[in-house]
């Protein structure tokens, strides 16, 4: 069983670039097309660790889906980000949906 450091709905930061993101899904290991030789995913250790689907914002504030290795991410301590309120709203919405009971027929 592989344990992940980050959860769905959690805000994270990219270690190298520093951008804020929200985890929307987790893969237990790299699960896209075979990586090119120069890609991060070509590293066996990274490829076999958890990978995260993360939503970030581009320079115009539009959402962008990224796929990042666990080693590329770090925890985000702040709860509010006035410069990127849509990511705060996305994280809160996901967490709420995960906690809300679902009615079934």
Swiss-Prot record:
Q: Which GO terms describe its molecular function?
A: DNA binding
**Any GO CC annotation of this UniProt entry:** cytoplasm
Write out the GO biological process terms: response to heat
Keyword Chloroplast found? no
Q: What are the subcellular locations of this protein?
A: Cytoplasm
Name any one Pfam family assigned in the record.
YccV-like
Report what the protein is called. Answer: Heat shock protein HspQ
Q: Which gene encodes it?
A: hspQ
